[in-house]
Every structure is written in C-alpha cells, then in structure tokens.
C-alpha cells in the first residue's frame, strides 16, 4: 500500500511514467513519454479534501485551530479516545498541564478554571496551576477529556473560567482550547503528525485510505 499526504508520487506503467502531484483538494496526473521530450497533463481529478489532516501534516497552526474550533466537542472526544487506544504515547504530549513554579502545583483539569489561592483547577488545555493545592505531576490529553470536556458538551472550543473571583491571567479567551490543542498537535514530530492526521481523518472527517496497487517502480518527493 502506498500512501501520500503531500508531495509527488511517480510510478511506471508499461513504457510510460505517471506522476501524481498530490496536494490539498486535488491531484493531477501527468504522463511522460520514454524520450522525456513531451509531458501530457490529464484532467484534474478531485479528492475529498481533509482539512484537519492536511493542516496537521503541513504544520498550519492557525488554520488547524480554526478548523478544530468548528468541530464539535463530541467529535474531539472521539478523536482523543482513538489516540488513547492506539497511540497513548502521543496523547501524553498533548495538553500537558504546567506547574506554577518548579515541579510543584501542576494544573489539575476540572470543568472550569479556578486558580485562586486554594485551587489549581484548569479548564484550558495545558493550563498552569495556582500557588497551592496543585497536582504533583502533569495531566495530559486523557485527563483533559475525562475531567474537562467530558462528553464534549462543555469547554470546547472555548474554556470556562470561574468568573470574577478567578485570577485575571487565566480568564478564558475565545477558542482557547482549540488553539492550544492545535499548537500541541503541530509540535509533534513528523511520524506522530502522520498518525494524528490519519486518526483525525478517520474519526472526524470520514476519511478513507487510498491504495495504489501493482506499482512497478516508485519515487516519492516531499
């Protein structure tokens, strides 16, 4: 099976070389004769575009954040569960809470942010704990879903804060959770982003894997 998210895939059929230019929304087929003197370009063939998957593998944080913000919280929960089941190591790199100082008082995921003197509750992905009552270790994507998003009906794409009593620096901002998740996904390494893109396509965008069979020779350029 040959899978390409972006770039160019070339393969030979008989005496001709066929090159697929693969990008967002479509690809074009090009036939090159043996002599290499002439190139014929066929009509454009459209693929079903997968916005979330594309934005992840190409590292477009702002576009990914905007696309995630339009995605339902319930779909995000399903995506997170898929990550936890198949690649929990990746989930440990997403929405990692931060300590208030040094290695103490990590943020603890909750339905709303409250980091007053007695609490370190956070509803923002990767939130920082308060000055006391914080966790002894970081919490990650799994806990963010379980304690903050729950069934997806709250805290997505924007987190909820406790209100006037909470510290001003942890006030919720529009689409803050969508932006934080997008940043963490884009910060993953190349292989991890490819895995995440596949899970996004499968769990949210209804993606399908396209197989190219009986390839006699291949070259991949990205």
Q: How should each PLM-predicted stretch be described?
A:
Residues 1-222:
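Long non-transmembrane domains of secretory-pathway and surface proteins
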């Amino acid at each position: 099976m040959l899978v390409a998210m972006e770039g160019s895939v070339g393969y030979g059929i008989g005496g001709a070389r066929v090159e697929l230019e693969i990008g967002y929304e479509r690809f074009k087929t090009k036939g090159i004769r043996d002599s290499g003197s002439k190139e014929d370009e066929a009509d454009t063939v459209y693929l079903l575009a997968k916005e979330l998957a594309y934005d992840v593998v190409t590292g477009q944080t702002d576009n990914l954040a905007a696309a995630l913000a339009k995605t339902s919280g319930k779909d995000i929960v399903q995506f997170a569960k898929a990550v936890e089941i198949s690649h929990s190591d990746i989930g440990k790199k997403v929405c990692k809470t931060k300590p208030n100082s040094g290695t103490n008082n990590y943020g603890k995921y909750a339905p709303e942010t409250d980091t007053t003197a007695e609490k370190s509750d956070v509803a923002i992905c990767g939130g920082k704990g308060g000055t006391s009552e914080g966790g002894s270790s970081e919490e990650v994507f799994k806990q963010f879903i379980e304690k903050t998003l729950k069934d997806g009906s709250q805290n997505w794409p924007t987190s909820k804060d406790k209100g006037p009593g909470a510290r001003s620096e942890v006030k919720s901002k529009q689409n803050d959770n969508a932006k934080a998740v997008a940043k963490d996904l884009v910060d993953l390494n190349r292989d991890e982003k490819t895995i995440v893109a596949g899970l996004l396509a499968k769990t949210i965008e209804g993606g399908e894997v396209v197989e190219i069979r009986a390839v006699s020779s291949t070259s991949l350029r990205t």
